[in-house]
Design a protein with these regions (language model features):
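Conserved, well-structured ligand/cofactor-binding cores
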Residues: 1-242
Length: 242
């Protein structure tokens, strides 16, 4: 503001910038400041890229969270099913009882839009010539949409999804007790080869790893069950022989 055509300030009244900038800050409630270099600011619209890049990073993370929620809630019988998302629609018109993860899906849609807007803003910034940046309307519009839609996506994800998530405790407990991957924690105690032997036998027979370890004479069932406690397995460090 105040640089006029190419940043020199030609034809702008003397003192114009010093008068207008504080007034804009007062009216908007935003700490607006004048550009330190008017010519550089007129040539370069890189600030749009900076802000849009931050929004793209937020969008990629937000969509990743939504993807995780969709995967963890998949089911109820043919998916992961670790968690239950609140039902926000009646579900499928041809599959009774099916509940779709519509909130994570709509959040991902907003994220895809913001990522696409970032590409459009980048191209619009790059397409400027000297002090002429004819595509600033696109930059402003795309950035405005990204800000609005990502903010709305965050709110709806919190209110309509995250706050209503329930853990499928029965299924999770069963998986913890039956998981073959628990032998990973035994590596420091019995070594990789014996742990792998237990895992392969458990997969082949369908037996719990504690039972298999006892059958193979590697460790008693009672000792293994005492070692493979959830609180211990979810803390830093390695299992040690008592």
């Amino acid at each position: 503001l105040g640089g006029t055509a190419i940043g020199t300030g030609i034809n702008a009244p003397v003192g114009y910038v010093a008068l207008v900038i504080p007034k804009l800050a007062e009216l908007s409630g935003v700490p607006v400041t004048a550009a330190a270099d008017m010519i550089a600011a007129t040539c370069d619209t890189g600030a749009f890229v900076d802000i849009s890049g931050i929004l793209k990073r937020i969008a990629s993370k937000l969509s990743k969270i939504s993807n995780d929620l969709r995967l963890l809630s998949s089911g109820p019988q043919a998916g992961v099913g670790d968690i239950k998302l609140p039902a926000r629609q009646a579900g499928s018109s041809i599959m009774p009882g099916k509940v779709n993860p519509v909130i994570p899906e709509v959040v991902s849609i907003a994220c895809f839009e913001a990522i696409g807007n970032d590409a459009a803003i980048t191209m619009a910034v790059e397409a400027g010539q000297l002090q002429l940046n004819a595509f600033e309307p696109l930059m402003a519009w795309a950035l405005h949409k990204s800000l609005r839609h990502l903010a709305a996506a965050c709110r709806t994800l919190q209110i309509n999804c995250v706050e209503g998530i329930e853990a499928n405790t029965v299924l999770l407990d069963a998986r913890i007790n039956e998981s073959v991957t628990l032998v990973t924690a035994l590596n420091p105690l019995i070594g990789y080869e014996k742990a792998a032997k237990i895992a392969k036998a458990a997969i082949a027979t369908g037996k719990p790893i504690a039972e298999v370890a006892e059958d193979l004479g590697i460790m008693s069932r009672e000792k293994m069950q005492a070692l493979l406690v959830v609180d211990t397995l979810t803390a830093p460090g390695a299992l040690r022989a008592s």
